[in-house]
Amino acid sequence: MTIYNKTIFRQADSRWGSLPYPTSSYSFAGNGCGCCAVAHCAIELENFKNYTPANFRKYMVQFATKGNGTLWNGITKGLEHYGFNVHWRQADTMEDIWKVLKKSLKKGVILFGSSKGGTKRVTWTTSGHFVAFVDWKYENGDYWFYCKDSGGRKHDGWFSYKQHMAGDVRNVWICTSLKSGYKFIGSS
């Protein structure tokens, strides 16, 4: 497994949940899932291992929209700002995503829509939600993602694409490589 930091952030945490995102009319608790997803990827790096969403919010708030959380390009910009080269794909065909995943760092962000996903009909959100994955594997004919979910449903741990996600994945941001000057926790 290549998970370097086990910390899981909740966007409603009292330390940052009441912070404005983007304005005082919209709280981080209700709109900060995109920022938390970027944070979950970035804390895997030595440079940001002790950061919290309050630290990441300072940069990410410029990509927040009133009542709609983080813009899609904000996820790309955030991951790039915090040390990753990123490949973004709309999930119109997962085959393209699987090809990129096989050459990736096993980290990224998934945007879920508002339907129930997979054969087990899992509810990830009722309106759209960003969730980080910090590892993945292919096992028994299915792709599995190790997710860190900042939302109240707390979908943390291993989730199967077929059983838990199929039909509800809208976009995927895949961290393909590290930029110069960045390294994973514990690596030389």
Range-by-range predicted roles:
Residues 1, 77-81, 164-167:
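Short, conserved catalytic or adaptor-binding loops enriched in Gly and charged residues
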Residues 5, 136-188:
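Noncatalytic regulatory segments and standalone regulatory/sensor domains
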Residues 50-98:
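Catalytic cysteine-centered active-site loop
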